[in-house]
Design a protein with these regions (language model features):
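Polybasic (Lys/Arg-rich)
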Residues: 1-79
Length: 79
């Protein structure tokens, strides 16, 4: 399972992707977070990155680390 924090404008996209099962918990800034079962892979990291910073992986720590490693590799490759 992962916990994702998303900007408010992604609520529709997240409902379309994950259905009505996850409970979206609102944050004070208008964003929301939710837990969802995910098969963590490079494709998952790419999906997160495809939203241009509008999704943050909050937990677990090893998945956050995976995002950092992937984006570091991409940044290095594109210098």
């Amino acid at each position: 399972r992962v916990t994702l924090r998303c900007t408010a404008d992604l609520q529709g996209a997240m409902r379309e992707r994950f259905g009505t099962t996850p409970v979206f918990l609102p944050e004070e800034d208008g964003s929301f977070h939710f837990d969802v079962p995910i098969c963590v892979s490079d494709q998952f990291y790419g999906w997160v990155c495809g939203f241009g910073g509008k999704i943050e992986v909050v937990a677990p720590p090893e998945v956050r680390q995976g995002i950092r490693e992937m984006t570091a590799r991409l940044a290095e490759q594109h210098q």
